């Protein structure tokens, strides 16, 4: 999927079934390395990143069958250095490191997804594993790690909140000797889901979802069954789709509790929202959104993965809105494409200022990443005219059947 034709002037209404969380499913798949037991995992989304992760596991010797529900047997792992051509495709491949070290005492991987030390906090992963007793050598963009005997439990104070590093340390500590405490840990729902999965296999983890996670190491893990949580970012994206188009939507098979901050902002924008056990209903019919001031923050704050979508919402809102990005650098690249579509946006340091206009215009735009792809497609749906969105190959990394789901609620999107 390289290029999409998107027809504008659409009001998006209807029902959407939310897929499983990519950000929970990916690490959970890599956590299966920790056990020889047979595992069954449900609600796995069909995404390119997931498929690459499965190829990585199979390369290591893991046996996998099934589709949305996977049966996994990691008892025959016999390779500890995955190939560069797979590791380089997804940043999430860093999560192979902790489980391989914990179970086998050795691992060798290339730096994932073209990451550079310092640009994304890969160094936090390595520092955490070093504190657990691993010896790590970094040379020629390759991480060579080993430990004599078992990893050793430790009190680890994270210098910066990091979802990825919290996952790496938590997974490695499950088989360490003694107890590990991760202080200043990430609190995301995905962390809670991963801990729940590991505990199902026999791990002893308490405190996931708080800033302090305690892991009592065990000798080995067993098999088990787990259902991956719904994707809160996909849910939020569809809610914004309806809000920006002045439509109404019901998202099914989702978890409202994971979206408290997003729902608060949508309500502030003027949407009527109702929630149930596993559904969210949004109604913005006949109302132009009000502008919002947003600052991204670690969970339970406003998610960085939703700021591009809300920039679109601010672009067509009444008033002037701001979005301040505190998690990642260079996350406003997409704004130049919204400006092509008529949006009035100014960038000042790590903040964008959106001067709301009534209507965007169609254009030929280029997406720079996963969330930008979704945002520009939504922009095309509500703009006047036909928009061509290029470089949409990013989309299938994190959204399952996104154009198809949008078409079911009133969009007209075609693959060119």
UniProtKB/Swiss-Prot annotation:
Record field: catalytic activity: phosphoenolpyruvate + UDP-N-acetyl-alpha-D-glucosamine = UDP-N-acetyl-3-O-(1-carboxyvinyl)-alpha-D-glucosamine + phosphate
Keyword Transit peptide attributed: no
PTM-bearing positions, type 2-(S-cysteinyl)pyruvic acid O-phosphothioketal: 115
GO molecular-function term, one example from the UniProt record: UDP-N-acetylglucosamine 1-carboxyvinyltransferase activity
UniProt superkingdom: Bacteria
Signal peptide (UniProt feature, chain positions): none
Repeat is among the record's keywords: no
One annotated Gene Ontology cellular component of this protein: cytoplasm
EC number in record: 2.5.1.7
Active-site residues, Swiss-Prot/TrEMBL: 115 (proton donor)
Subcellular location: Cytoplasm
Keywords attached to this entry: Cell cycle, Cell division, Cell shape, Cell wall biogenesis/degradation, Cytoplasm, Peptidoglycan synthesis, Pyruvate, Transferase
InterPro entries: Enolpyruvate_Tfrase_dom, Enolpyruvate_Tfrase_sf, MurA_subfamily, RNA3'P_cycl/enolpyr_Trfase_a/b, UDP_GlcNAc_COvinyl_MurA
HAMAP family in the record: MurA
PANTHER family given in the database record: UDP-N-ACETYLGLUCOSAMINE 1-CARBOXYVINYLTRANSFERASE
Stored NCBIfam families: murA (TIGR01072), PRK09369.1 (NF006873)
Family: Belongs to the EPSP synthase family. MurA subfamily.
The protein's name: UDP-N-acetylglucosamine 1-carboxyvinyltransferase
Taxonomic source organism: Buchnera aphidicola subsp. Acyrthosiphon pisum (strain 5A)
Name of the gene this protein is made from: murA
């Amino acid at each position: 999927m390289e290029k999409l034709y998107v027809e504008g002037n659409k009001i998006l209404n209807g029902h959407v079934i939310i897929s499983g969380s990519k950000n929970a499913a990916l690490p959970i798949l890599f956590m299966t390395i920790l056990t020889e037991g047979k595992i069954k995992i449900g609600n796995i989304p069909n995404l390119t990143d997931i498929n690459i992760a499965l190829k990585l596991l199979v390369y290591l010797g893991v046996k996998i069958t099934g589709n949305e529900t996977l049966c996994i047997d990691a008892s025959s792992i016999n390779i500890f250095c995955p190939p560069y051509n797979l590791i380089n495709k997804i940043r999430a491949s860093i999560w192979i490191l902790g489980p391989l070290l914990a179970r086998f005492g050795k691992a060798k991987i290339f730096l994932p997804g073209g990451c550079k030390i310092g640009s994304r906090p890969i160094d936090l992963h390595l520092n955490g594993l070093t504190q657990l007793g691993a010896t790590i050598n970094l040379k020629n963009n390759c991480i060579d790690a080993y430990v004599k005997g078992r990893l050793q439990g430790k009190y680890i104070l994270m210098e910066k909140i990091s979802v990825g590093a919290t996952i790496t340390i938590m997974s490695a500590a499950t088989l360490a000797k003694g107890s590990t405490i991760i202080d200043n840990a990430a609190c995301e729902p995905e962390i809670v889901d991963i801990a729940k999965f590991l505990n199902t296999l026999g791990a002893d983890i308490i405190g996931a979802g708080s800033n302090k996670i305690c892991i009592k190491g065990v000798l080995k893990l067993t098999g088990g069954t787990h259902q991956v949580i719904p994707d809160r970012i996909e849910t939020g994206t569809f809610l914004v789709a309806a809000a920006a188009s002045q439509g109404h939507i019901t998202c099914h098979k989702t978890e409202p509790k994971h979206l408290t901050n997003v729902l608060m902002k949508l309500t502030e924008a003027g949407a009527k929202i109702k929630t149930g056990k596993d559904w969210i209903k949004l109604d913005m019919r006949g109302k132009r959104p009000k502008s919002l001031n947003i600052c991204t923050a670690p969970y339970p704050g406003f998610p960085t993965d939703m700021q591009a979508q809300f920039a679109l919402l601010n672009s067509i809102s009444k008033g002037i809105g701001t979005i301040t990005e505190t998690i990642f650098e260079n996350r406003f690249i997409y704004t130049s494409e919204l400006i092509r579509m008529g949006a009035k946006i100014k960038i000042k340091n790590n903040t964008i200022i959106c001067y709301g206009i009534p209507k965007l215009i169609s254009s030929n735009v280029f997406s720079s990443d996963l969330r930008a792809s979704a945002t520009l497609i939504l922009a095309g749906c509500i703009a006047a005219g036909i928009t061509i969105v290029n470089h949409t190959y990013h989309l299938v990394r994190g959204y399952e059947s996104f154009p198809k789901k949008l078409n079911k609620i009133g969009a007209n999107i075609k693959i060119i």
